[in-house]
Amino acid sequence: MFEKGYVDENYVRIPKDELFSFVVRVLTKLGTPEEDAKIVADNLIMADLRGIESHGVQRLKRYVDGILSGGINLHPRIKIIREGPSYALLDGDEGFGQVVGYKAMKLAIEKARKTGIGIVAVRNSNHYGIAGYYALMAAEEGMIGISMTNSRPLVAPTGGVERILGTNPIALAAPTKGKPFLLDMATSVVPIGKLEVYRRKGEEIPEGWAINSKGEITRSVEEVFNGGSLLPLGGFGELLGGHKGYGLSLMVDILSGILSGGTWSKHVKNTNEKNSNVCHFFMAINIEHFTPLEEFKGRMSEMINEIKNSRKHPDFERIWIHGEKGFLTMETRLKLGIPIYKKVLDELNEIARRVGVKGLEV
């Protein structure tokens, strides 16, 4: 999504700091340590700032339910199970995925500073928000960052009709002379949160996103939520590369779940269930160990400019680079406020009443 500043009457704008404080209020009231609450809030707000509504504050109810059901451990003892100069294996002790992920990527960056590369695999965690958050942590330190996570089964494999794969996102960030390059994508056609957005709006989804329980392509959100499945990146069958998205999803499960000794998507549970056992994978690559950082940034910018200045299709205004829309949307929303769908605002204020904190005023 790229926002130029206009939103319709179904949205209200809320300043970033106000929304951040609200999330922290809710989480700390429920017993989350303030430092951890700020990490979770930062992750959610970054999603909304970048236009990723599916992973923004609309997800807060899921985390509140996870806390109240015992699915999220507010005081995890995050353990290093194995460690070497350039790698580590962590057990997240069912903590907030955002908190576990933040600490894991920090560790990967620290190791990359010393050895050139840092790899951290994580098991026994929870949903960690947007994958790009962690990849950008490395890019901001002048490194290449890679982040991925498995998730509960929502996607049918190519040729199947059963939910057996996760949406299993992948992110890679790299510094340039300007804003970082940021690829942040699900390995399904869309993440499940996109369907939740359409459900709230009462709209049909685009054709090609999902199938119903019989394996038929559907535009009905309810058919998807009632036994249907999302499709892997590339869509239905092999003609447009659905088997490639399927393969990328398995790659995430191998690096996140199987390598860590955790589990793969078929056996991952929802956030409000105990032992959801979400698994992550983080990598930081210290560019200076391979080539001078400024030279790398220059070459990145040169490549990007060549692509953006190449001949454009008449149906498109411009050629975008991954992450560019998100940074431009962030600039707009930092100035004007974050647009929140009114139904989401009602849900957030219901959460506030439920836990006993001040709600959001517009």
From Swiss-Prot:
InterPro entries: Mal/L-sulf/L-lact_DH-like_ah (IPR043144), Mal/L-sulf/L-lact_DH-like_NADP (IPR043143), Mal/L-sulfo/L-lacto_DH-like_sf (IPR036111), Malate/L-lactate_DH-like (IPR003767). Keywords: Cytoplasm, NAD, Oxidoreductase, Tricarboxylic acid cycle. It is an enzyme of class 1 (oxidoreductase). GO terms for cellular component: cytoplasm. SUPFAM superfamilies: L-sulfolactate dehydrogenase-like. It catalyses: (S)-malate + NAD(+) = oxaloacetate + NADH + H(+). It is found in: Cytoplasm. GO terms for biological process: tricarboxylic acid cycle. Pfam families: Ldh_2 (PF02615). Its EC number is 1.1.1.37. GO terms for molecular function: L-malate dehydrogenase (NAD+) activity. Homodimer. Belongs to the LDH2/MDH2 oxidoreductase family. This is Malate dehydrogenase. It comes from Pyrococcus abyssi (strain GE5 / Orsay).
